[in-house]
């Protein structure tokens, strides 16, 4: 008997989604999978008033949490930062009694406006992407979640249609069975 694929909550945070070809292409396979819930934070919370109880309920219902967003000033868009600060609260995700996310999986899916070569100690951004994403990795650890290797689409605007299609195909295959497919 085959087990069901893990339930994935894909938290999508892009304030200008209509202008992001790469993110729209990446979302297409996710929207076709029955085990994936795509949750567009900017569509749900244009006023930034986050329904914390609703968001925490969504987190409880899923096994894998994917954070898909562009890299903004070496971090995430403002609404996702607000979401992280408000939803992953002490007593829910961390601290005494805060074990609701323990054992779940965290994966960041990031698009950037610069090439991979810009993320080195001797390059434009002065740090490799592993250092830039360290706050997210630490947040996952604080929540007792398993950190999975991030998916990074560098220089997203300069990716060809064929390259984006290839990324989307691989992403969709991973989303279909994320825990067995790995990514750590």
From Swiss-Prot:
E.C. number: 1.6.5.2
Chief localisation class: membrane
UniProt-listed GO biological process terms: positive regulation of potassium ion transmembrane transport; potassium ion transport
InterPro entries found in the cross-reference section: Flavodoxin_fold (IPR003680), Flavoprotein-like_sf (IPR029039), K_H_efflux_KefG (IPR023947), KefG/KefF (IPR046980)
GO cellular component: plasma membrane
Alphabetic keyword roster: Cell inner membrane, Cell membrane, Membrane, NAD, Oxidoreductase
GO MF annotation terms: electron transfer activity; FMN binding; NADH:ubiquinone reductase (non-electrogenic) activity; NADPH dehydrogenase (quinone) activity
Domain of life: Bacteria
Compartment(s) of residence: Cell inner membrane
Lipid bilayer topology: Peripheral membrane protein
Reactions the enzyme catalyzes: a quinone + NADH + H(+) = a quinol + NAD(+); a quinone + NADPH + H(+) = a quinol + NADP(+)
Subunit structure, as described in the record: Interacts with KefB.
Record's function text: Regulatory subunit of a potassium efflux system that confers protection against electrophiles. Required for full activity of KefB.
NCBIfam families recorded: PRK04930.1
Protein family according to the UniProt entry: Belongs to the NAD(P)H dehydrogenase (quinone) family. KefG subfamily.
Name of the protein described by the UniProt record: Glutathione-regulated potassium-efflux system ancillary protein KefG
Source organism (scientific name): Citrobacter koseri (strain ATCC BAA-895 / CDC 4225-83 / SGSC4696)
């Amino acid at each position: 008997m085959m087990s069901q694929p893990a339930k994935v909550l894909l938290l999508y945070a892009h304030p200008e989604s209509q202008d992001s070809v790469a993110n729209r292409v990446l979302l297409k396979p996710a929207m076709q999978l029955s085990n994936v819930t795509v949750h567009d934070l900017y569509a749900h919370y244009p006023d930034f008033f986050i329904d914390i109880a609703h968001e925490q309920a969504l987190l409880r219902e899923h096994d894998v949490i994917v954070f898909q967003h562009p890299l903004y000033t070496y971090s995430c868009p403002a609404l996702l930062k607000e979401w992280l600060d408000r939803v992953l609260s002490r007593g829910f995700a961390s601290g005494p009694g805060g074990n609701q996310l323990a054992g779940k999986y965290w994966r960041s899916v990031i698009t950037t406006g610069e090439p991979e070569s810009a993320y080195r100690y001797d390059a434009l951004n002065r740090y490799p992407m592993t250092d830039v994403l360290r706050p997210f990795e630490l947040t996952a650890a604080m929540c007792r979640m398993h950190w999975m290797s991030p998916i990074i689409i560098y220089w997203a605007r300069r990716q060809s249609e064929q390259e984006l299609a290839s990324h989307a195909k691989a992403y969709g295959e991973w989303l279909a069975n994320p825990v067995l497919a790995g990514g750590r």
